[in-house]
Amino acid sequence: VLYSGFDLTAPNTSVSMTINGPAPTILAMFMNTAIDQNLDKFKEENKREPTDDEAAKIKAWVLENVRGTVQADILKEDQGQNTCIFSTEFSLKVMGDIQQYFVHNNVKNFYSVSISGYHIAEAGANPISQLAFTLSNGFTFVEAYLARGMHIDDFAPNLSFFFSYGMDPEYTVIGRVARRIWAVAMKNRYGANERSQKLKFHSQTSGRSLHAQEISFNDI
């Protein structure tokens, strides 16, 4: 019902979900909805049920084409929000399960995690600490996925980042610095290809920076 009227596999449709602990369940529901949409489309166009082979091909096509992002960053849940549902170890395992499913089903256009510094900054971190914690979390996911036997170039393009931007001067370069550190580490430490070296991020204004009065900027 929620996505009625939306073609979830259209090239111009991308769904971003800010969900973390329940991410595996919500993501599974979303993927099944996208698959069901296309199965229903087949039935409407062909006036019959698809065969098992046709249904399998439809599912594979959907997973290869669906676009979006699921936040699913359990590490910042612990560091910045204190809203952990499961232990860190179990959560990393489940996140690894998601990424392994993406690899096995060629899910290339969906970000399996949005590694989030925003919430860490809102909890009190300055720009430098935000960047340090966020990249550290990113490398933690990389090491966890590599330990499960996944190849760096099979999963690194599915990783995205989320940074806070405020009034501190360091925010003017946080994106460039993050991209530089990530690219160098991906290339030199992990032997990743050019696509995997690209750090893709979203940013938005820091909520805690929006003060009605701030002496540092209003004393002139």
Question: Model-derived features: where do they sit?
Answer:
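Conserved, mostly hydrophobic/aromatic
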Residues: 182
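Conserved active-site neighborhood of enzyme catalytic/cofactor-binding cores
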Residues: 220
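Catalytic core of soluble alpha/beta enzymes
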Residues: 185
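Extended amphipathic alpha-helical segments with heptad-repeat/coiled-coil character used for oligomerization
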Residues: 213-214
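Catalytic alpha/beta active-site cores
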Residues: 1-174, 189, 196-204
